[in-house]
A protein has these predicted regions:
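Short, low-complexity N-terminal tether/leader segments at secretion or assembly junctions of large
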Residues: 1-35
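N-terminal cap/lid segment of alpha/beta-hydrolase-fold proteins
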Residues: 40-105
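Short substrate-entry loop that stabilizes the transition state in hydrolases
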Residues: 104-108, 117-156
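Mobile cap/lid helix-loop segments that gate and shape the active-site cleft of serine hydrolases
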Residues: 124, 231-296
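Alpha/beta-hydrolase active-site loop
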Residues: 166-188
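Short beta-strand/loop motif that positions the catalytic acidic residue
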Residues: 306-308, 312
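C-terminal catalytic histidine-bearing segment of alpha/beta-hydrolase fold enzymes
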Residues: 321-324, 328-385
Length: 385
């Protein structure tokens, strides 16, 4: 069993002398994990073992993965030996935030994949995850948090300066998350099973991780999630992104046919949406059947809980409601909490929680304001530890 106590240069000492450790050699940090060292008590032993913690503990680690951005859709008339797959490697950025309690050996740390929304990115030197309340709260309570951009920067430039924020949960994004997950498992001391949290456009990313990857997921949470490539991204994208926004990313990544004489400069008028080319990466069309009773039945491989505001005009709540109901119809574990008001800012609905269950001091030493959806996400994950 391990007890994290603080910085120490002390050598192992008998248990009877724990209270006599030279205070000049120990900087005690009470009731708060630290990234410096820990003392572990071996069963049936009268020795205190002092070990130095990982240099990654309490740090933000940046990394890259290589993504093959060659087109993936194969037309029916190209299934013969004449068709050759291609390799077009691009670099995508990743971020990994370690809790103070992380160690290179011994007890494993739980990893959370936190997929950024359409207002954030992961770059060479920054990420949305570092500033989100849920990421900071999870890290403060012993979780590691990982994200990637999901749309390689140079690829976005080569395709006409696509919005870097819009990974749209595509097969390119799935490659990036799979490779980032494998990187984390191969190089760090993490449990293989992860939690997922996605905010806004991060909702379609995390949902496609569940539907299209081998990553083992304990549970998924989503705030105001995007779930429908056609109705939410193509027909009704966020108001400020109708031109060269997520629709343009869909068109370029999936190879939509261009319109010869577009009716407007809007993305939805410049290309022809093709559900077949989406190849199942539209969650609303994936893994769902309609029963004789007219109801939709969706088999989903992990528990899921979404939060959404009914007056959200950026990402409508109705697809979220339909998605959750289809999982419930099939006997799955799925929950939806709806707020009457709050718009697209689910994260800020309600008064701060007066007595959060977890530690609220972030890795930078600041106090985290915990709103209801943040606390409820934390508690939801705790159910499946």
């Amino acid at each position: 069993m391990s007890k994290i106590i603080g910085r120490t240069t002390a050598t192992p000492v008998p248990r009877s002398d724990w209270n006599q450790i030279d205070e000049t050699k120990v900087d005690f940090i009470k009731n708060k994990p630290t990234n410096i060292a820990f003392i572990s008590e071996e069963d049936n032993e009268d020795i205190v073992v002092v070990e130095t913690a990982s240099p990654y503990a309490g740090t933000i680690h940046r990394f890259t993965v290589e993504v093959n951005c060659a087109p993936m859709y194969i037309p029916e008339d190209n299934l013969g030996p004449e068709f050759n797959d291609d390799y077009q490697p691009y670099t995508d950025y990743g971020v990994l935030i370690f809790p103070d309690s992380y160690t290179d050996k011994g007890n494993k740390t739980r990893l959370v994949i936190s997929a950024h929304g359409g207002g954030g990115t992961v770059s060479a030197d920054s990420s949305q995850a570092e500033f989100q309340s849920i990421s900071r709260y999870l890290v403060a309570n012993g979780y590691a948090v990982m994200d990637v951009n999901g749309l390689p920067e140079q690829y976005a430039i080569d395709k006409g300066n696509l919005r870097l924020q819009d990974s749209v949960g595509s097969y390119l994004a799935m490659q990036s998350y799979i490779k980032a997950y494998n990187y984390c498992m191969e190089n760090f001391n993490f449990h293989p099973e992860v939690f997922l949290v996605g905010i806004s456009e991060g909702g379609i990313t995390t949902t496609n991780i569940v539907l299209h990857t081998h990553i083992p997921v304990l549970a998924q949470a989503g705030w105001s999630p995007v779930l429908d490539t056609y109705n939410q991204i193509w027909l009704d994208p966020w108001p400020w992104c109708s031109v060269n926004g997520p629709g343009a990313v869909l068109a370029n990544v999936y190879g939509f046919e261009p319109v010869e004489s577009p009716a407007s400069t809007k993305d939805r008028d410049k290309w022809i949406y093709d559900e077949k080319k989406i190849m199942g990466y539209n969650p609303m069309k994936c893994n769902v059947t309609t029963g004789a009773d007219g109801l939709e039945y969706r088999h989903y491989r992990c528990p899921v809980k979404f939060w959404h505001c009914m007056d959200d005009e950026t990402v409508r709540y109705e697809p979220t409601e339909a998605f959750i109901k289809s999982i419930q119809n099939a006997g799955g574990t799925a929950y939806l909490k709806l707020y009457e008001t709050g718009g697209h800012e689910t994260a800020y609905v309600g008064d701060p929680v007066p007595n959060p269950l977890g530690n609220t001091i972030a890795y930078d030493g600041t106090e985290i304001e915990i709103k209801p959806v943040c606390e409820e996400t934390f508690l939801f994950f705790k159910r499946f530890e």
